[in-house]
Amino acid sequence: MPKSSSSLESLKHQALGPNSEAASEAFEALTAIGTEEVAQFYLGLLETAQRGWRYRAAMGLMHLGDARAVAPLLRAIQLPETRGCNGTLVYVLTQFDCRHLLKELFQMVFQQGYEAQLMAMMAIEDQDFEYSIEDAAYIQQQWAVAQLAPSESLLELGLENIRELVEEL
């Protein structure tokens, strides 16, 4: 039975409220409802500055299997204010079809924090990709730059591991 509009509005209000336990329960209920209105609500929250809302919305979209989340997730991952705290967003992104996102995933490996880098590397290792010669050249050029002054997190991931992924292109 579909929820009434007033019930959905009440759950949305609760999801954005100050009580974290009630908010978490509201997000779970909204995800279980899973209507187009819920999906639109979640898509809008991917753009918010509020990290907790953004993460819960991303997880909800993942559970709904809504591939419309891919472009907003990419934008949210690339925001300077999410650097260092966007591993969950990268994880959710990699649960969708990423076959055309090889260049973007390598950019995450080269430019993001450890958790996001790790999630992106796992996706690169696990998924099959379709990419152009230009994409491969761009990735190789970015890899050359990253090796000049590798970040601590790149060193932790293992330069040899990354090199192997790049050389497979």
Question: Which residue stretches match the model-derived regions?
Answer:
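Generic helix N-cap/helix-start motif at coil->alpha-helix transitions
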Residues: 3-6, 15-25, 48-56, 80-88, ...
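Terminal, low-structured helical/coil segments at or just beyond the last alpha-helical repeat
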Residues: 145-169
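Alpha-helix boundary/capping and short turn/kink residues
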Residues: 20, 32-35, 51, 63-67, ...
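N-terminal interaction modules that seed assembly of large macromolecular complexes
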Residues: 24-62
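Hydrophobic core positions within HEAT/HEAT-like alpha-solenoid repeats
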Residues: 24-27, 43, 57-58, 74, ...
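Amphipathic alpha-helical scaffolding segments comprising HEAT/armadillo-like alpha-solenoid repeats
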Residues: 1-14, 33-47, 66-79, 98-110, ...
